[in-house]
Amino acid sequence: MAKIIKYDEEARQGMLEGLDELANTVKVTLGPRGRNVVLDKTYGAPTITNDGVSIAKEIDLEDPYARIGAELVKEVAKKTDDVAGDGTTTATVLAQSLVHEGLRNVTAGSNPIALRRGIEKASDAIVERLLSNAKPVETKEQIAATATISAGDPEVGDKIAEALDKVGQDGVVTVEDNNKFGLDLEFTEGMRFDKGYISPYFVTNADEQTAVLEDPYILLTSGKVSSQQDIVHIAELVMKSGKPLLIVAEDVDGEALPTLVLNKIRGTFNTVAVKAPGFGDRRKAMLQDMAILTGAQVVSDELGLKLDSIDDTVFGHASKVIVSKDETTIVSGAGSKEDVAARVAQIRSEIEDSDSDYDREKLQERLAKLAGGVAVIKVGAATEVEAKERKHRIEDAVRNAKAAIEEGLLPGGGVALVQAAADVQKNVKLEGDEATGAGIVFRAIEAPLKQIAQNAGFSGEVVIDKVRTLPAGSGLNAATGEYEDLLSAGVTDPVKVTRSALQNAASIAGLFLTTEAVVANKPEPPAPAAAPNPDMGY
C-alpha cells in the first residue's frame, strides 16, 4: 500500500486533531455529573456507557493522521484500564492537556527531548508523592465508597464490598446476567470447576439432580479411565473404608463407565466420575491444584503411576463434594496449609511474569479457587442495553476496589493530583527546557479537576483557585457541590488508578512532542460505480 508522509509541525498538528476528537468525546463522562455516550453498533442495540476505554475503542477516524493521534490516546486509556481497571478518562484528559501545553512550547522553540525529560522527572516526583500520601483501606465501608464512585451506584458499591470482604483480595468476583430484575450476590464455597457428572446415574439427590459425597476419597488422574480391571482394583481399595469416591479424569469410558454405574446402582460403593477441567497444560496445572488442596497425588504416566497398581495413599480427601450436571464443588479439602500457601505463592509469581491478559485471568481464577473464593454478582435490568451497560460498570468497579485494597486511597475528584503537584513543585530543581517540561506537568495536572467541575456546572478556574486555599485532602465534592474533606465524605480514588493515569499520559505526551515525521497509509480512492446493466430496462 502507498504511503503519505508529513513532517514537523504539520505532522504533529494532524495527530493533535485526532487526539482532540477522541479526548473531547471521552471527557464529557468524567466525574459524578459526567454524561453518557451512545455507541452505535453494526449489529444489535446501541451501547450507552460512560466508560472511557469502551468509548475510545469505538472511535475510528477517516483522516490517516488524525487516526494515528487517536490510536496513541487509545493506548493511554487501554493501558490504564489494563493496570488499574479504571481512570481511563482521567488518563485521556491528562494526555490531551500535556500534549497541548507541550506543543505550545515546542512551537516556541523549546527542545522536545529536554521537555520530555522534564515531563518524566516531574511525573515521577508526583507519583512518589501520591504513594506517600496514600491511606490504606481498613474498612468494608471504604471499599464500598470507592466502588460506589466507580459504578455511580451505592447498591453496587455495597455488593462489591460484601463480595470482597467474603472472598478476600485473592478471590474472584465475576459479573453475570440475571434472569430477574436487580442485583443478586452468590458465593461459592470451596473449589468449583465447570465439569459435572459424566452419567446421570451417579445422582444421589433426585430432586436437585445432584450427587453429594460426604467425606469422600478423591482420585485424580491425567489420563482416561477405560479398563474394567482398573475399576476393580480401585473398588477394592475404596470398599475397605466404606467411603464414597470422586474420580476426576480426562474421561471415563469403555468398560469402566458401565462398571462404575452398575456398582452405584447395586449399592456396592458410592462413586461419581467427572471430567477434568481445562485442556493441555492448563488441565495438568488444575489437577495439581486439586491435588494440593485435597492432599491427593495425581496418577500420571509421567510419574510412573498406573491405576491398576496404586494404593490408597494417592487418594485425596475433603469434607464434602457436590456434583451437578454442569459443575463440581470440593468443600474443605484436606491438603496441607503449607503446601497450599506455597502453591498460591507460585501462582502469584506466574501472574506477575505473564504478559498475556488471558493467561493472567486464568491464573487469577486458579489463585482464587485455592486462596480465596468466588463471588458472583448477578445483574438484571429492564432492557438488554441497560443490563449490558450496568454489567460493564460493575466489572470496572470491582477492579477499582481491588486496586484500592492493593495500594491504598487518595482524595478523589482530581484533588490528589493538584495538591501533590503543589507540594512537589516547591522541591523540583531543574533548569532550562527540563524546567519548562516540569512546568508543563504542573499546569496540565489541573485538567481532570477542571473537567469534573465543568461537567458538574462549575467554573474550572474558580474551583482550582478555591482548592489551592483548602487544607490537604479537602476539595470539591462534585456530586453535592460542597467543599469538604473528601476522604471523610467517601470521595476517594485508588492510588493505583491515579498514578497509572499520570504515568501513561506522560509517556504518550513525550512521544507526541518528539515526533518529527508521520508515515500513514494513503487512503484508497472510492471504487467507481458499477455500470448499469442494459438488461435491467425490461
From Swiss-Prot:
SUPFAM superfamilies: GroEL apical domain-like (SSF52029), GroEL equatorial domain-like (SSF48592), GroEL-intermediate domain like (SSF54849)
Keywords per UniProt: ATP-binding, Chaperone, Cytoplasm, Isomerase, Nucleotide-binding
Subunit-level organization: Forms a cylinder of 14 subunits composed of two heptameric rings stacked back-to-back. Interacts with the co-chaperonin GroES.
A GO CC term attached to the entry: cytoplasm
Chief place of localization: cytoplasm
Cellular compartments annotated: Cytoplasm
Keyword ATP-binding (UniProt): yes
Species for this entry: Scardovia inopinata (Bifidobacterium inopinatum)
Enzyme class (EC, first level): isomerase
Function: Together with its co-chaperonin GroES, plays an essential role in assisting protein folding. The GroEL-GroES system forms a nano-cage that allows encapsulation of the non-native substrate proteins and provides a physical environment optimized to promote and accelerate protein folding.
Binding site for ATP: T29, L30, G31, P32, D86, G87, T88, T89, T90, G413, N477, A478, A479, D493
Name of this protein: Chaperonin GroEL
Any one GO molecular-function label of the UniProt entry: ATP binding
UniProt EC number: 5.6.1.7
Similarity field: Belongs to the chaperonin (HSP60) family.
Keyword flag Chaperone: yes
